[in-house]
Amino acid sequence: MTFINRWLFSTNHKDIGTLYLIFGTWAGMAGTALSLLIRAELGQPGTLLGDDQIYNVIVTAHAFVMIFFMVMPIMIGGFGNWLVPLMIGAPDMAFPRMNNMSFWLLPPSFLLLLASSTVEAGAGTGWTVYPPLAGNLAHAGASVDLAIFSLHLAGVSSILGAINFITTIINMKPPALSQYQTPLFVWSVLITAILLLLSLPVLAAGITMLLTDRNLNTTFFDPAGGGDPILYQHLFWFFGHPEVYILILPGFGIISHVVAYYAGKKEPFGYMGMVWAMLSIGFLGFIVWAHHMFTVGMDVDTRAYFTSATMIIAIPTGIKVFSWLATLHGGTIKWDPPMLWALGFIFLFTIGGLTGIVLANSSLDIALHDTYYVVAHFHYVLSMGAVFAILAGFTHWFPLFTGFTLHPTWTKAHFGVMFTGVNLTFFPQHFLGLAGMPRRYSDYPDAYTLWNTLSSIGSLISMTAVIMLMFIVWEAFSAKRKVLQPELTATNIEWIHGCPPPYHTFEEPAFVQVQE
């Protein structure tokens, strides 16, 4: 098989998963570089980069790169492609060529996003792309249009991927295997795919109307022609809120596997409760979107509804957190690096969830909206939730993907550095938010200097951790320590074919013996 046939025209779920992991790693480093520019600007009062336009272009690009080109490709494209077929005993994904197209839509999409920064003044709209700031007066030129096309491609990629995963998971299990016997990671990807399938078309509609408002003189979001900019916010957040659950749900699946494995348990505590909790989170995620819009002047009864509905999500989330703790209980805990990431995830994700409950209160949110309290909240659940889950999964399944083991001491040291860095970066931002420092500004009054400086020092520590990770991966491929014998394969069937598994697995249907 030629290099081009294998890597450009691939129809193999393992190879496509590897492509996604490499692309996501690369994009993650670009997104980290953007975040370091943000923290360099905010490290002390005064100006570093120029005006607020270039600052907001960097903020916007940081968000898009991290969400659409790092977290989603790694979690859904990388881990999803690699593990879902292995975990359900399928020979590949349901639509292998569409799988390849889903991946190859991402590099052009990334290219369009980068292009949007290089023409005119760039898209300094924030990742929400609200009009009228994103309209053709405040953002004349092609920047926002290129960003919109970038989102279109990334969206098509995710929709096709979602169709592929839903079909694969429902249709390609052995007949004897019921949906309630599939591993939790498979469930998490299935629910994530359903969320993508239902939410992305609404985003596509919203940004397409914005595109025609900008270029064809329609007035969907322009009051002068009977439109309403608030409509855009509803359309965007109807996608945007499910999106944040799309980013964390596969992480829930990963953490369930890692915690059970390193606690020496044959399954996570409360399997059915975990499944129903994820289903509930997926459903509730669609009916809370306007909690992002408490400041736009909705009726008090509307705000009361969105406050209560948002708080209800804490219940299934709590079920998951306590089930993970119950899985740990009585286990023989192996303090391997994946377990450290998983425990860090549980602790920090819970803190992020608690600040989320604070923000759910519509009255409190009036004061906290668009302050650094919100930034701190969602970076606790993303930078320490989603990213810690990715690193737990990566350190756990790296031997499966490559056949080589990571250096245990250096991987633990990497966890320590990263844990310190992200907490020093984002914990002080709660104080800044409570003190009223607004988001998306490149400068601030002197009173905010201390916490901003500490936050920026934290970002440099996190950067050190990223460099350590790259070195750790290089070291593993360089030293070529082989995997001797994976453990607990009876309840972790992705490992049964060896490390790494052969190019084709389950070529003949798997034999499934159902427990009585």
UniProtKB/Swiss-Prot annotation:
Its main location: mitochondrion. The lineage of its organism: Eukaryota, Metazoa, Chordata, Craniata, Vertebrata. Na(+) binds at E41, G46, S442. Fe(II)-heme a binds at H62, H379. This is Cytochrome c oxidase subunit 1. It comes from Coturnix japonica. It comes from the Eukaryota. It holds the Pfam family COX1. The gene is MT-CO1. InterPro entries: Cyt_c_oxase-like_su1_dom, Cyt_c_oxase-like_su1_sf, Cyt_C_Oxase_1, Cyt_c_Oxase_su1_BS, Cyt_c_oxase_su1_dom. GO terms for molecular function: cytochrome-c oxidase activity; heme binding; metal ion binding.
